[in-house]
Amino acid sequence: MPELPEVETSRRGIEPHLVGATILHAVVRNERLRWPVSPEIHALSDQPVLSVQRRAKYLLLELPAGWIIIHLGMSGSLRVLPEDLPAAKHDHVDLVMSNGKVLRYTDPRRFGAWLWCTDLDASSVLSHLGPEPLSDSFSASYLFEKSRGKRTAVKPWLMDNKVVVGVGNIYASESLFVAGILPDRPAMALSEAEAGLLVSTIKGVLMRSIEQGGTTLRDFLQSDGKPGYFAQELQVYGRAGEPCRKCAMPIESSKHGQRSTFFCRRCQK
């Protein structure tokens, strides 16, 4: 599933091609995504793109009439292509632009979303979200106070969007390894120093992944069709049985909340 770095990579890739151009119309080939494509998107006509923003794993296209909210789901990607390039089997939505380009949404599993909203503060998919991990709001004091009394294992706790947004399975595993914290420790067991270390580690891991264009494990592609290269730098995720890059002890895996977790028992405490 595309996580925050992949969504931010997509945002940065499409922004120069959209802002200042006008959406002439939308082409919806299959509206049956996680939720049906909003009827307002079907009816789009002559709407200039004012900005391309991101909140958590949602891309937000600001138009004079409202906002398009895009979620990439499990397997979605966005590419900027020539308008005359024929659509393929899993190309479900196009935004045809005034500059001769098209923003094309591809999603083999169809678990993404294209929604319409006139007031972001009232959006049901955005209103409950916690702070952005790269913002000043996500601080050592915030994370430490938030963890008090929480018996939940720290890894699934970090993946709760009410705690912090955009830290999915890959980056939670990687950040906990770099911080030296076992993923099954209760969140309430974090010391204030460990909370600070974890915050700085999460920020660093996410920023490094964004610099590398995200992580491509299966379906994710950047807006130019290239894969993300952070997969080559993964320390523990997907490496069960392989030697730890620090101590050579085999990487272990376990299940937390139906998701695989990867860690080094020697390097993490």
Curated annotation (Swiss-Prot):
Details of cofactor binding: Binds 1 zinc ion per subunit.
Residues the entry annotates as binding DNA: H90, R109, K150
EC number assigned by the record: 3.2.2.23, 4.2.99.18
Alphabetical UniProt keywords: DNA damage, DNA repair, DNA-binding, Glycosidase, Hydrolase, Lyase, Metal-binding, Multifunctional enzyme, Zinc, Zinc-finger
Residues in coiled coil: none
InterPro entries tied to this protein: DNA_glyclase/AP_lyase_DNA-bd (IPR015886), DNA_glyclase_Znf_dom_DNA_BS (IPR015887), Formamido-pyr_DNA_Glyclase (IPR020629), FPG_cat (IPR012319), MutM-like_N-ter (IPR035937), Ribosomal_uS13-like_H2TH (IPR010979), Znf_DNA_glyclase/AP_lyase (IPR000214), Znf_FPG/IleRS (IPR010663)
NCBIfam families hit by this protein: fpg, PRK01103.1
Function: Involved in base excision repair of DNA damaged by oxidation or by mutagenic agents. Acts as a DNA glycosylase that recognizes and removes damaged bases. Has a preference for oxidized purines, such as 7,8-dihydro-8-oxoguanine (8-oxoG). Has AP (apurinic/apyrimidinic) lyase activity and introduces nicks in the DNA strand. Cleaves the DNA backbone by beta-delta elimination to generate a single-strand break at the site of the removed base with both 3'- and 5'-phosphates.
Annotated family: Belongs to the FPG family.
Name of this protein: Formamidopyrimidine-DNA glycosylase
Name of the coding gene: mutM
